[in-house]
Amino acid sequence: MSLDLALDVQYATASDYLPSEDQFALWVKTAIGNSMEQAELTIRIVDARESQMLNSTYRGKDKPTNVLSFPFEAPPEIELPLLGDLVICAAVVENEAREQDKTLEAHWAHMVVHGCLHLLGYDHIEDEEAEEMESLETQLIESLGFTDPYKEQ
């Protein structure tokens, strides 16, 4: 089964390196796998100011963050392939990649996979859930040719 993906990438900030729409599509398809036959998803790339505003509004944390996931929840009687939205802060991803000694491409891929797993219902609040999510992230990231994102450098 191949995923029929409708992906809208919104570049709301500039940066030295931003992944292409094709890269985003590959990472999303890898993360979603066979979970759905069709999916519609928006990825919005933002600056630190917009990330901080959204993080403050929706999570009560007054600072920019790497990725925010906004799952779409349709009423029970309506079936739509809308997965939701990811908002990724380019500046935070770049800083984290540098601090963690990772390539920008690898860290972008990790943030997309991580965000998509949240949209699919995975979480990392409880230790057991975190282990399951991190294990799946690692498998998916390694399948893309990158190293374990949680391995200490």
From Swiss-Prot:
GO terms for biological process: rRNA processing. Signal peptide: none annotated. Its main location: cytoplasm. Zn(2+) binds at residues 114, 118, 124. Keywords: Cytoplasm, Endonuclease, Hydrolase, Metal-binding, Nuclease, Ribosome biogenesis, rRNA processing, Zinc. One of its GO terms (molecular function) is metalloendopeptidase activity. NCBIfam families: rRNA maturation RNase YbeY (TIGR00043). This is Endoribonuclease YbeY.
